[in-house]
């Protein structure tokens, strides 16, 4: 018996994806929507079987000592299954960006020049223990006219296999290429190494996972990536802030959820309002069990107000994405210092200012070099659904191609189209 060769297998997957991408680029909106709606119905129909298959993945993960948070991400509950199905219906209802022509201009020569939105081609998506990503990613790629290669975590291999079969069923029902969505069927990590170097077959890689995964892919990939490494998000309370508004925003930005990449990790406060802003906020944070790591000026302000249990912030804290109930706080001399801090220590993800001063707010928008910059809003709004994109495949803090939450348009590109009437260049 011939030994399994992961490189040969991945090359086959790549060739099949490239061939399927041509059919996907030609697919009409009704055809793509039919595949999504069939998949939604199939997921609801097979919910019990999906839970049984998923239970085996969960049992293995527990036996391997995975923690409760990991098990929670891996588990397909009734609610998670319904969320997947409903998400498919929402994506089907979104406008189809493919074929849209914009920016049409008449040139003095008589030609008309515009831009048409087209699929990227083949998208490789690498993710960890969430089976729902298999469906979400497949749906966005189908709707945007792309073929996709999905490589989920080995811990979810049976769940992903069951979902892959349903995706193939939906593609077949709509008359779309069967290999438009392929789920890598081997747990061999070498498959990831091959996927991220197949420039002849794969147009872009979208990684979704922890910092160690993203860092490894950044180092080894030859295929371009849409990604973000860190979510070191800031809120700056300006000298002209409405303090009640600032307290609400900063409470939500830190404590609504600790793990998402759009959670605030560093709070900056203008010196003139430090006592008024930090006293109520520190009370809220300590009541909720948030550890406060503070600069010397912040410590002096809070200790004068009777607070204890504070930790000294180190240089490393300003660079840290905690993803936990920990917050670093710095008192600054104003908006200049706040912008300087953010552009020095931030990760170009999401940053917000609380101010009633229009000029200061607009300056913050212009000068903070991040994918999302906000005035008087929680960083937790940095999300594709909240931005009206309907769904997102991830968030990018890069500057090329997609930036910020990546929805359907982020999985497309623009090509120039020219309409002539027999003109020739002289």
From Swiss-Prot:
Disulfide bonds: none
The protein's annotated pathway: Amino-acid biosynthesis; L-proline biosynthesis; L-glutamate 5-semialdehyde from L-glutamate: step 2/2
EC number: 1.2.1.41
Location of the protein in the cell: Cytoplasm
Keyword Glycoprotein: no
Keywords, alphabetical: Amino-acid biosynthesis, Cytoplasm, NADP, Oxidoreductase, Proline biosynthesis
Database matches in CDD domains: ALDH_F18-19_ProA-GPR (cd07079)
Domain of life assignment: Bacteria
Reaction it catalyzes: L-glutamate 5-semialdehyde + phosphate + NADP(+) = L-glutamyl 5-phosphate + NADPH + H(+)
GO cellular-component term (any): cytoplasm
Uppermost EC category: oxidoreductase
Stored InterPro entries: Ald_DH/histidinol_DH, Ald_DH_C, Ald_DH_N, Aldehyde_DH_dom, G-glutamylP_reductase_CS, Glu-5-SA_DH, GPR_dom
GO molecular function annotation: glutamate-5-semialdehyde dehydrogenase activity; NADP binding
GO biological process: L-proline biosynthetic process
Keyword Cytoplasm: yes
PANTHER family tied to this protein: DELTA-1-PYRROLINE-5-CARBOXYLATE SYNTHASE, GLUTAMATE SEMIALDEHYDE DEHYDROGENASE
UniProt xrefs under NCBIfam families: PRK00197.1, proA
Protein family according to the UniProt entry: Belongs to the gamma-glutamyl phosphate reductase family.
Role according to the record: Catalyzes the NADPH-dependent reduction of L-glutamate 5-phosphate into L-glutamate 5-semialdehyde and phosphate. The product spontaneously undergoes cyclization to form 1-pyrroline-5-carboxylate.
Protein name: Gamma-glutamyl phosphate reductase
Gene label: proA
